[in-house]
């Protein structure tokens, strides 16, 4: 997006994008342990944002790694109990209770699940060397 502020910290209707994601998981299962993985350099900033925007969702914060794989691995290491694990990109705040319910039910039934949302094709008008997006 080209912002100086990382996407997960942008405000969406008075709350950070990451906070909105956390709130959906907490509402789905208040006993769930949420683990937030962030670059080490962003952890204190996140804690400040939690205080400023009243992010009261209980969660554990761990340092990420060099690559996404390393960050997921660090998050997995922070898990203290056995159970089904959901890995969610916190900059995707439009996760719904239904998505979580379907994902967890499928994982319980088959051992794993990968939720997805169908992509929407865009309509473009090409005029010589340029193109523009058309309203649907």
Where are these regions (language model features)?
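N-terminal glycine-rich phosphate-binding loop and ensuing alpha1 helix
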Residues: 1-43
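Short active-site oxyanion
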Residues: 31-35, 58-59, 111
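Structural beta-sheet core signal
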Residues: 36, 87, 112-115
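Acidic helix N-cap motif at the loop->helix transition within catalytic regions
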Residues: 44-49
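Conserved core of the sugar-phosphate nucleotidyltransferase
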Residues: 95-136
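Glycine-rich phosphate-binding loop at the start of an alpha helix
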Residues: 19, 69-73, 97
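Residue-level signal for inorganic ion chemistry
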Residues: 9, 18, 75, 88-89, ...
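Short phosphate-binding loop-to-helix
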Residues: 51-84
């Amino acid at each position: 997006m080209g912002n100086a502020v990382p996407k997960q910290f942008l405000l969406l209707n008075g709350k950070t994008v990451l906070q909105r994601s956390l709130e959906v998981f907490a509402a789905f299962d208040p006993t769930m342990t949420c683990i937030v993985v962030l670059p080490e350099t962003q952890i204190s900033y996140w804690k400040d944002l939690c205080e400023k925007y009243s992010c009261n969702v209980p969660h554990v914060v761990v340092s990420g790694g060099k690559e996404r794989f390393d960050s997921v691995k660090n998050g997995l290491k922070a898990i203290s109990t056995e159970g089904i694990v959901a890995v969610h990109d916190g900059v995707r705040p439009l996760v719904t209770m239904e998505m979580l319910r379907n994902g967890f039910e499928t994982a319980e039934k088959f051992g794993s699940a990968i939720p997805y949302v169908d992509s929407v094709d865009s309509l473009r008008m090409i005029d010589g060397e340029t193109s523009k997006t058309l309203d649907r």
